[in-house]
């Protein structure tokens, strides 16, 4: 009798283990993530980082908006890495697809953390990114509400600037990109239970793409002569 009870208990535990939902991982990086050869051979570096995100999003699990003021953590819907690092890597991928002006390529450092601290030496140009909002909405329709502030900074090489400014980054351009709206259509290749999450992840990724395009345009069109000299490497 005791053995039967033990066997039943073991069967219940096994069934409970089988019912645990699997973890699903998402990334902001575009599918064709490999940087083109021209970008990798470019002589000048745009360092991506630091990238900061709201404290509430500083976790691997998804935080989803519910109603006007609520939020819910989805334990089994996860980013492939910390959100700040994923934003940094996605920014690198989008920038190195071609929108950067000639002679520049983007890098988030060997670890891809977006901190900029792991680069071998200070880059002449740096992109600081502050994610102000990164709202994921699943119902009634998958959507996002994003707000990202970006700042291009230049490390002057002009010795005439004096000891106060020497070795300090100066702001070239700063702006805020707002992106909100319905997520793109469902991808039939994704299992049905995951389509809402996949749509939201792709919408967030599109926000990063728009920021990358804004940054590239600002680098191409800078009218500030000192900034222009820094960007062109003169």
Task: Give short role names for the model-derived ranges.
Residues 14-17:
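C-terminal motif of bacterial Sec signal peptides marking the signal peptidase cleavage site
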Residues 70-77, 157-215:
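Short secondary-structure boundary motifs at beta->alpha junctions and helix caps
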Residues 217-234:
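Short, highly charged C-terminal tails/helix-capping segments
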Residues 43-126, 214:
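N-terminal segment of the mature soluble domain
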Residues 19-36, 98-160:
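Surface-exposed short loop/turn segments
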Residues 45-50, 63-65, 126-131, 145-151, ...:
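Soluble periplasmic/extracytoplasmic beta-strand elements of cell-envelope proteins
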Residues 3-9:
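Sec-dependent signal peptide recognition
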């Amino acid at each position: 009798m005791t053995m039967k009870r033990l066997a039943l208990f073991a069967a219940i535990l096994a069934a409970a283990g089988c019912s645990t939902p699997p973890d699903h991982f998402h990334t902001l990086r575009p599918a064709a993530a490999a940087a083109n050869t021209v970008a990798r051979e470019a002589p000048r570096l745009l360092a991506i980082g630091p990238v900061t995100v709201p404290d509430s999003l500083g976790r691997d699990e998804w935080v989803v908006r519910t109603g006007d003021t609520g939020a819910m953590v989805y334990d089994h819907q996860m980013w492939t890495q910390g959100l700040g690092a994923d934003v940094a890597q996605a920014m690198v991928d989008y920038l190195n697809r071609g929108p950067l002006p000639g002679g520049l390529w983007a890098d988030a450092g060997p670890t891809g953390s977006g901190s900029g601290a792991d680069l071998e030496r200070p880059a002449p140009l740096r992109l600081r990114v502050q994610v102000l909002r990164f709202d994921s909405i699943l119902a009634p329709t998958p959507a996002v509400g994003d707000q990202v502030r970006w700042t291009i900074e230049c490390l002057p090489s002009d010795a005439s600037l004096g000891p106060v400014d020497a070795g300090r980054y100066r702001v070239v351009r700063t702006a805020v990109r707002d992106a909100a709206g319905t997520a793109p259509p469902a991808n039939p290749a994704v299992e049905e239970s995951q389509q809402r999450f996949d749509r939201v992840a792709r919408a967030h990724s599109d926000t990063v793409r728009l920021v990358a395009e804004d940054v590239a345009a600002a680098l191409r069109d800078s009218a500030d002569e000192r900034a222009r000299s820094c960007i062109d490497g003169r």
